[in-house]
């Protein structure tokens, strides 16, 4: 049984008669102890879909789904009180920018202990010791003294470690990490990902890694979900997708990586940008940018089809093992 079950999730903004479909009928599941990577450019709907799961989409946003379940609970039907008890305790999220996610007016220790107090209670000394243990667990040196510092006194990497400590304070079953390495240097990025995977294995929690960097999740994730313009365009085993993508967009993301560069002088890029509300093309949303697009692609939206190898691809002409479209 899946821990998280998402079926035809949509998030719309703006006028109901002509909404902007930030997330458009996406479906996926996450099992206990599984690492899932959600990949795509900025504007693909990765973060919005996760905010919808957390119940953090405010008006004028509208969340619709045929099924949105966590651990057997229908997230669309639970009360606000039930959701508050769930979020932060059983489901937690690490946001993109730790420097703006932490409250600058309160010490690091107060913010961690507040999360523990809300969901687990306990006396002040117990909460303080738990906060020290958490900071030690995420690799912050001299954790007892760091409880009394303010966010502005920490580096970006240390701030992100504090955010991770807050997220795992109540031992969640599902942790969503939204671009957890944004604005960090390459060395710190590797340390943060290594830390998240170490915690995931130790606690046997499900981990959803949201990123624009396919290489970041290729080795860490069991399964990869590729999103484009609010839609899922490819899903499947991480190793298989990394070595033989079935969708042109996934192929383009891979070709932009240095290790896949065919031209050693210049990295490949996909021309154009992710379409917004007013420039969404007919047919396949990728067709203006796709080198393989045909008249059929420009007229008819493809379905997300199950392929023979168990993967899914939203393409009329899924790529073969050699990277060529099956025209």
UniProtKB/Swiss-Prot annotation:
Organism listed in the record: Escherichia coli (strain K12)
SUPFAM superfamilies named in the record: P-loop containing nucleoside triphosphate hydrolases
Enzymatic reactions: a dipeptide(out) + ATP + H2O = a dipeptide(in) + ADP + phosphate + H(+)
Domain of life: Bacteria
Function according to Swiss-Prot or TrEMBL: Part of the ABC transporter DppABCDF involved in dipeptide transport. Responsible for energy coupling to the transport system.
GO molecular function list: 4 iron, 4 sulfur cluster binding; ATP binding; ATP hydrolysis activity; heme transmembrane transporter activity
Gene Ontology biological process terms, A to Z: dipeptide transport; heme transmembrane transport; protein transport
Subunit composition and interactions: The complex is composed of two ATP-binding proteins (DppD and DppF), two transmembrane proteins (DppB and DppC) and a solute-binding protein (DppA). MppA can replace DppA as binding protein for heme and ALA transport.
Family listed: Belongs to the ABC transporter superfamily.
Family annotation (Pfam families): ABC_tran, oligo_HPY
Record keywords: ATP-binding, Cell inner membrane, Cell membrane, Membrane, Nucleotide-binding, Peptide transport, Protein transport, Translocase, Transport
PROSITE patterns referenced in this protein's UniProt entry, alphabetically: ABC_TRANSPORTER_1, ABC_TRANSPORTER_2
UniProt-recorded name of the protein: Dipeptide transport ATP-binding protein DppD
